[in-house]
Amino acid sequence: MKILLLEDVKNLGKAGEVCEVKDGYGNNFLIANQKAKLATNEVINKYKAEAKKKAEKEALEKAQKLQMVETLQTITLTIHKKVGANGSLFGAITKEEITERLKEQHASLDLDKKDIELKHPIKSTGIYEIEVKLGSGVVGTFKIDVVAE
């Protein structure tokens, strides 16, 4: 019997492949556990159409992420904080604060705190380069200027 795999199956194939299996294995295990469907022309064409839509959606999302990275690289985020006598901040600048200030100063950029990579919290004034990982292999940086209030 010919089946279309819906997910990767060890020693058989990867999702989307059409495989020839024995009737019992196909009906009693693969189809029963929704790991595969009977490979008819209709099922194969439907799966290919869904895969194509998914690939187009992923390409669009990646393009949007690349556009966001290009925009991020052109900005410098300014954060005003109270500073002690030796130039250190009262408190530290964290990922949450960076995302809040980014939304305030640049409303079109919507980053989540999990997208920002901080090696350590920022505790003094100066200019810092912050790394942003948006998924799909898209990585960028932007600058933060921490100034005394």
Curated annotation (Swiss-Prot):
Q: Where is the secretion signal located?
A: none
User: What keywords is this UniProt entry annotated with?
Assistant: Ribonucleoprotein, Ribosomal protein, RNA-binding, rRNA-binding
Source organism's superkingdom? Answer: Bacteria
Q: Which GO terms describe its cellular component?
A: ribonucleoprotein complex; ribosome
The answer, when asked if Hydrolase is one of the entry's keywords, is no
A biological-process GO annotation:
translation
Q: What one GO molecular function would you report for this record?
A: structural constituent of ribosome
Database matches in InterPro entries = Ribosomal_bL9, Ribosomal_bL9/RNase_H1_N, Ribosomal_bL9_bac/chp, Ribosomal_bL9_C, Ribosomal_bL9_C_sf, Ribosomal_bL9_N, Ribosomal_bL9_N_sf
Pfam families given in the database record:
Ribosomal_L9_C (PF03948), Ribosomal_L9_N (PF01281)
Q: Which family does it belong to?
A: Belongs to the bacterial ribosomal protein bL9 family.
HAMAP family from the UniProt entry: Ribosomal_bL9
The function of this protein is:
Binds to the 23S rRNA.
Q: What is this protein called?
A: Large ribosomal subunit protein bL9
